[in-house]
């Protein structure tokens, strides 16, 4: 079976803080699975199923979360560029999805079974600062 090609979907807060992210179309019309971590919004989160429809300009736009994917958003800051790969490997080994946008900051989609406190402790034990 061929893999469905991701599409860009627009996310915003009442018109502000606009950003786009990759989403995978699902079988049911207007439903997509978020395949990125958003930088400007805590929700929706990686893996959530969302409803998206075209806006007046023809851009797919998120309308609502249909089914949560079981993750929450977090940010972990780190002091040195070489810490990025170390943290990504460590956190992914615990089921955490990661994305970097700017130096020193890692955006996370953490499984709800892993408490935020544990994520910070894991990171602090491996990376100084």
Model-derived segments and their meaning:
Residues 1-28:
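Short beta-strand/loop turn elements enriched in aromatics
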Residues 26-36:
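Short, structured beta-strand/loop micro-motifs enriched in basic residues and often containing a Trp
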Residues 56-67:
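Short, Lys/Arg- and Gly-enriched loop/turn segments at beta-strand edges
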Residues 66-80, 105-108:
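Short glycine-/aliphatic-rich beta-strand segments at the starts of folded cytosolic domains
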Residues 81-129:
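Helix-rich terminal scaffold detector
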